Amino acid sequence: MTTIEYLFVSLSLIFLGGYHATFFYQTKKTPGRTEVGKAHARRSVWVDRMIAREDRILAIQTLRNWTMSATYLASTAILIAAGLLGFLVSVDKISTLVLEVNVLGSQDAGLLTLKLVLLIANFFAAFFNFTLSLRFYNYVALDIGAADQSASQEERKEIVGHLIRAANHYTWGMRGYYLCIPILLWIFGPLWLLAGSVLTTVALYRHDHVAGHRSI
């Protein structure tokens, strides 16, 4: 890589890595400031209300919607990863076109291969998280179906824990989709990588934080 590419890659990692480290810290320490933290609190209320109902159709329908969404995104992620694997076979053919528009970055075809490998790994990670999300949603369906209205606090906390873990893996899977934007742009040069990282970070900040707690 060229010196300027090292610089832009480092800045991109600082933007994305620093933002996510801060975001997950806030989710744990001050959950009321983040949408994820507030959603976790609502999930606890949701579990209590679903257990209190004799008719669990609403719970079943809600879980069905969540599992269908995770299934679709997992399938899409693995299909994209498989398609990108096909590009690796013909990387020499596509490298000529890509390197023509990569003005500031390295002209090494091996680096292009590395970028594609990172993109593939990113989608495999997204697929893995969505499948884990499905696993825990299935646990929740079983837990709520087996729980009665006299369920203890320990049982309720276990159900909430499974639901939160399912939601967390879904969130991490979605991060894989978001992070593919700067990685994909990096193929066309480090300047595009930096621009994509900054725009992705700003967009995530505005969607991850409660409106009253945003500073930008």
Language model: regions and residue ranges:
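Hydrophobic alpha-helical membrane-embedded segments
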Residues: E5-T34, T71-L85, L116-Y137, Y178
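Alpha-helical transmembrane segments and their membrane-interface exit regions
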Residues: F15, L199-A211
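Juxtamembrane "helix exit" motif at the C-terminal ends of alpha-helical transmembrane segments
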Residues: I80-L104, W186-L194, T200-Y205
